[in-house]
Swiss-Prot record:
Residues 21-42 have a biased composition (Low complexity). Residues 7-16 have a biased composition (Polar residues). Glycans are attached at residues 201, 204. Residues 43-54 have a biased composition (Basic and acidic residues). This is Sodium-dependent nutrient amino acid transporter 1. Residues 1-58 are cytoplasmic. The chain crosses the membrane at residues 59-79, 92-112, 130-150, 155-175, 240-260, 269-289, 318-338, 352-372, 412-432, 458-478, 485-505, 527-547, 564-584. It is a multi-pass membrane protein.
Amino acid sequence: MELKGVHQQNGTSNGTGAVGAEGESAPPTAPATAEAAASLETTTEKVDAEQQKPERTNWGNGLEFLMSCISVSVGLGNVWRFPFTAYENGGGAFLIPYIIVLFLIGKPMYYLEMIMGQFTSQGTVKIWSVVPGFVGVGYGQAFATICIITYYSSLLALTLYYLFVSFQSVLPWSYCWEEWMNCVDSRPQEDTDALLLSSSNVTNVTALTDTVKLQSSSELYFLNVVIKEKMDISDGIGDPDWKLTLALFVSWVVIFLVIMRGVKSSGKAAYFLALFPYVVLFILLVRAVTLEGARDGIIFFLEPQWGELLNPTVWKNAVVQCFFSLAVGSGPIIMFASYNRFDHGIYRDAMIVTTLDTLTSLLGGITIFAILGNLAHNLQIENIRDVVRSGTGLAFISYPDAISKFQAVPQLFSVLFFFMLFVLGIGSIVALQSTIVTILCDQFKSWKYWKVALATSICGFLMGLVYVTPGGQWILTLVDFYGGTYVVFILAIFELAGIVWIYGMQNFCDDVEFMCNRRVSLYWRVCWSFFTPVMMIVIFIYSMVTIEPITYSEQFFPEAGNVAGWLLFGIGAAQFPLWWMWYISQHREGSLGQSFVASLRPSDKWGPANPETKRQWVIFKNEKAAQRATKKQSSKLGAFWQKLGHFCGSNT
């Protein structure tokens, strides 16, 4: 039986039959009962008041949405973070827990967030009309998103700085400066005659070899020239560097220009933000695999350390990387999907993005470790582990060091590499920043989108200044650990629990069937209701039990830093109970216990945003409920006659 008019959005309708995940037709719906009619009448009165609401802007076409999801999910996490994470957690063996985590946590969470955004046409806060008491999940995710935005933008500033200086005739990090007495050139050995070093300085460096640890010019350039690193922040973090401040400002100008008109502007930019990095990545891949030593680097990356599979930390890091890479749990996926038409085919998009994300991570890892293999070959270092650095050091020390050793036009490859990183970073921050702007515009309908985008961009720039100080990398490490990773993780657990355990798996699956015209397969049901939440809870508990004080450059943070970090985590995590208590205090229904129970029931605002679609949804839900009631009654009646038959048979 067709569900005519079910998918009406923006004045159009899609009256296709409900088709299962394996192509089977949905069961025929029973006629609407009197109870359903009464419910429909009540809902009609409620949605009539919504008729005057301005309709939500939609993507220009479905491809813009797909490109936007690719631009945020296929980002810095694939090229910068994944290779090092894989290398640290068993190399090729890490791919096994990562792929398992992807299928049991990553894909289910990604698809669920797409569904929630598209079904409600609301951002990460407003979707919680499904379980109003859980609105703090949305606000907590917004807090974590703000934390991530601030330090992500500082990485953009560093990338832009390196991009600008890459246009010089000689890469500035490729040679030693006179004051660096413990320096070794990053340029190829045959180019040393072109270095701006005096013979006395070279002699001094040679004399120091046995007593002082030598450092590459790329490392000293990053630490002493670019970030002017402080090794101790007990006396403060210092003042912002003017060059990095300028780069930070330019980065935020670009971000604002991309998001100023919402999806109308960011959707067009998404084509470039999503596709251009692949062009550069393939160019770098072709160049990288032809370098001497590239094979050793790739083998080092892919060679499995099977013993690591039994290490719980590896599984924890696989989950963290999956969240970081796919951008789930922080709001962008919900936000992007909220601008879709109600009947958009998100199942296909979710599968494309999550698969492409994994393939890109592998591609990025092979490319990067091929380059690092060449670096080890040029330095005559057998263990590639000795040339690999973590964190920002991987992007701004190891990579530049390797690129400076390219024999042919290293400036070109440097420009391509850092421009690719800049584009990847812009794609990620555009999504994160748009999430915050959408939350504010959903809450305050009269606010102009571009004004909110401008105000939040200014705030983002001002907050980002703390990271371009000499002690900025300390703050980045602290905020990422306490304000980003763990806050996102614990709130993602509550997000999943609120939808599938409190709202209910059956209710949620009915909503998906209504919107997508396809039944929810057993795989999704089992993951959402059991595997995904249980695995996340176990891993979070393990992380909390085994947590250790964080370090930067092998140095522990001062006590005040750890206190500030836990305070940051507390602010993010506390959004959940605080907003729950606030909701109960503002919506009292009888006793405290009754108000508590009421906070777990969907509010009148829950459902499709389009009034006509909402009417059809209520009819569909009531028909589904009637079908289940009839089936249950028939089942009981059948059991009764079966027992009666057995009884009569036993007495004859």
